[in-house]
Each structure stands twice: as structure tokens, then as C-alpha cells.
Curated annotation (Swiss-Prot):
The keyword Glycoprotein applies. Coiled coil: none annotated. SUPFAM superfamilies: Kazal-type serine protease inhibitors (SSF100895). This is Serine protease inhibitor kazal-like protein, minor form. Does not function as an inhibitor of trypsin, chymotrypsin, subtilisin or elastase. Binds sperm and enhances sperm motility. May act as a decapacitation factor, suppresses BSA-stimulated sperm capacitation and blocks sperm-oocyte interactions in vitro. Residues 1-23 form the signal peptide. The keyword Acetylation does not apply. InterPro entries: Kazal_dom (IPR002350), Kazal_dom_sf (IPR036058). PANTHER family: SERINE PROTEASE INHIBITOR, SERINE PROTEASE INHIBITOR KAZAL-TYPE 11-RELATED.
Length: 90
């Protein structure tokens, strides 16, 4: 390969790199983000054990096993939803 091609490929890489790095955000757009749980669906803890694990982080910085457990505790503790996933700091 000539040095001209190497320079061209290097510049092309520098130009296209930001697009490849930020293209992941396309898939995590607002329509794909999990919304706050609909707590009217959950009435008691007994029905929570049948629901799969789907962690919810609340404003008390505790991680709840799934939406159901979060919603039941929300009534008692007046919690606010932060995001779906494990709370990353305590």
C-alpha cells in the first residue's frame, strides 16, 4: 500500500469513528427506554414472586427485585422511581 492510501484510511477512520461510537444511542432512544412501572397492576406481595427479575432502582437508592416489589414498597415508603436496573451507588 502506498502512503497516500494509508493517510486516506487514517483520515477516513478519524471521520467515521464518532458515528460508530454514537450509533449505539440510536438503539437506546426514548421509545426503547423502560418507563416507570404502572403500580395499579400490583395489589400484594404474594403475586410478586411469580414475576421475573427486572430490577428497579428507587430514590432511596435500594434495588427492588422487580416492578411488583417496588410498587408495593412505594405505597408504604412513598418511594419515587429512578430507573430500571440495579442502583449503582448507595
Amino acid at each position: 500500500m502506498s502512503s497516500t492510501w494509508i493517510k486516506f484510511l487514517f483520515i477516513l477512520t478519524l471521520v467515521l469513528l464518532p458515528y460508530s461510537v454514537f450509533s449505539v444511542n440510536i438503539f437506546a432512544g426514548p421509545e426503547n427506554v423502560i418507563k416507570e412501572p404502572n403500580c395499579t397492576m400490583y395489589k400484594s406481595k404474594s403475586e410478586c414472586s411469580n414475576i421475573a427479575e427486572n430490577p428497579v432502582c428507587a430514590d432511596d437508592r435500594n434495588t427492588y427485585y422487580n416492578e411488583c416489589y417496588f410498587c408495593i414498597e412505594k405505597v408504604v415508603e412513598k418511594l419515587k422511581y429512578r430507573y430500571h436496573g440495579i442502583c449503582i451507588y448507595k
